[in-house]
Amino acid sequence: MKLSVNDLNVFVNTPKDIAKLCEDLSRLGLEVESCIPCIAPKNVVVGKVLEKAPHKNAEKLSVCQVDVGKEVLPVVCGAKNVAPNQFAPVALKGAIIGSTTIAKTELRGVESHGMICSSIELGFPKINDGILELDESVGELVLGKELHEYAPFNTHVLEISLTPNRGDCLSVLGIAREISAFYHTPLKPIKALNFTPTSDLITLSADENIESHLAYYLICNHSLKTPLNIKLSLAHNNALSENDLNNFIEFSAHFSGVILNAYSLNKTPIDLIIKNDENNLESVYINHQKRSTIVIKHQDQKDLSECLLLEASYTDPVSLSLKLHALKDKTLQKDNALVYRSTRGSNPNLSDGLNFLSAHLKAAILESKQTEHSLKDCALTFQLEDITEILGLVIEAEKIQNILKNLGFKVSTKEPNSKPQILEVIVPNFRHDIKTIQDIAEEILRFVGIDNLVSKPLHCVSSKNSNPHYDTHRFFENLKHKALACGFKEVIHYVFYSKEKQQKLGFEVLEDPLELQNPITTELNTLRTSLVCGLLDASLRNKNLGFKSIALYEKGSVYNSKREEIQKLGFLVSGLQKKESYPHAKGKAWDFYSFAECVSRIIGDFSLEKLTTQTPINHPYQSAKIIQNNEIIGVIAKIHPKVIQELDLFESYYAEIDASKLKRPAMLLKPFSIYPSSVRDLTLIIDENTAFSKIKKALKDAQIPNLSEILPLDIFKESGNTIALSVRCVIHSLEKTLNDEEVNSAVQKALEILEKEFNARLKG
């Protein structure tokens, strides 16, 4: 949005401090992106061309006698449009035009005492080719008067960035309203034209479903020569055209904010119909011929007649935007600038636009018509405390009312004696953005100033909003990242597998009534009951591709014999744990405990117990149940050598874990001792069928003071059914350094419990 300060002065007296004006507009939310002075240079005066004669030594030059008030000067000029009796700006001796200082000079043998200037040479936008022709629209032309003494040639051009909801400020009148409200200066309204209809040529009819508001003036005896002040205003806004009628329409729309159009007519009866076209867009038909699509596309006016039908229109911006969005896939003829102005909200006071345009056309109004639609008022009711709560700032009731009244709101007190005080506000029809009490608060804040808000800390209590599904997802994502860090590669397989292969490996299968009715292929004829089968297939493919070190991880669904879905984790390692590299010249193969340790780094600490039942896939002596939190969560085993041989695999190990039984570890703080610990190693003679886990549990349940940890060290076969089990007892206190007597006491109590529970004794 571009406009000059001179344009604003049509509606309001602007302050002389332009920098302060720009700063205040930006505070109001109308951000001034640039402010460019447009001031004519000094020693450029109003002159009148008295005579024009051809240059004796140059065909394209002419010698003009120019009256500059005090004297008549000969000036050599090369412009084609220079002519006698023409007023034009003349740069006299000493004037600086661009980077050139004007001086008396000789051009092709003829003296020239100045320069007749174009608008571009004066630092203004291009108005026309050749010199700038002056007229009385800029003020009374006095020969010899400095050009910068005329307001249009001594102004500033502002470029204002508007938010999409402020369509009311897409006009000079809209910006002037804001200035008037902020500086408490009166707004100069557009004068209403008094006229008496002298014809009855227009018959206006509109369909019932028409939403647009329309008003018409039939005029004649109009003047269609664009005056200089209009040209300058449009040129500043990059909207000047060669069509005079379009210039008047654009100028009036730019100033008033009303969408305007004009139709060239003969002075005959006019059948004016408003109805929807083939795209369901409201259109104007004159004598059954479509002439325009309301607020979307206007026809260019070329052949002008004595009579013109002026049209002012308004369509609700929200309704229009929805219609255009519904037709986004269709190719529509539309004027983008017109649609931009319409969809952001034009001025619904149609008479303002028609009166402004008619006055500048200096036309006689023969007749006026308008549709019978009327805009509904938007009323908002609120308490003063509501504004205080929203802004966090106490503002006096009188100040709030004055701000709103200055902005054009109608404010009344509802139930004057009530406490708290209740206000009812009628929103002006040109403010399409005001819908709620929050919008009212924003208007008040704009004029109070956001800098005047008191900074306060935000008092809030944040409750933990836990999402169990997300927590579970993050838990398994973290497990996956740990597996990747340990060298495992994630794999994904179908949930379908071969029933025969699963049975051969010893895994359960679905009950016959629950089997797939229409399997994809014979190789995928059932639902998998274990992840291990797919991992074995993937291991074989990688072996065949030349990989010697294979570590795979998978999380997925498996099904039990009742076809109930279970989420499981699967791990499989095959071949080398470490590739051939110093110090392992032949590589390092996996072993059971290395694999178990690797899995524990991923899922957390666990213990192992011997499997009570064996399956064909498991090695009978290297397989175990995985125990975590006193619960069986899965199986870990070496693949049976027969299976390895049949499948042609490297030596392999697998672990399969029920994902539902894995628990997120609680973050618990535990104290640690700053005092040294004591270690006692014991070798016990004990029954070979006694599991170390039972020994550990018995000592833990006994809660022996200062005995913090017991670890297995070694095992030896003794005579008969006994073994020699070496264990290490770690003893320390959180409170002090223990002496030998206290350490020996803890060891003695441990031996007593072991002897009582397991018939264990120290090896002699």
Swiss-Prot record:
One of its GO terms (molecular function) is magnesium ion binding. Residues 375-455 form the B5 domain. It catalyses: tRNA(Phe) + L-phenylalanine + ATP = L-phenylalanyl-tRNA(Phe) + AMP + diphosphate + H(+). Keywords: Aminoacyl-tRNA synthetase, ATP-binding, Cytoplasm, Ligase, Magnesium, Metal-binding, Nucleotide-binding, Protein biosynthesis, RNA-binding, tRNA-binding. Binds 2 magnesium ions per tetramer. It is found in: Cytoplasm. Belongs to the phenylalanyl-tRNA synthetase beta subunit family. Type 1 subfamily. Tetramer of two alpha and two beta subunits. This is Phenylalanine--tRNA ligase beta subunit. It comes from Helicobacter pylori (strain J99 / ATCC 700824).
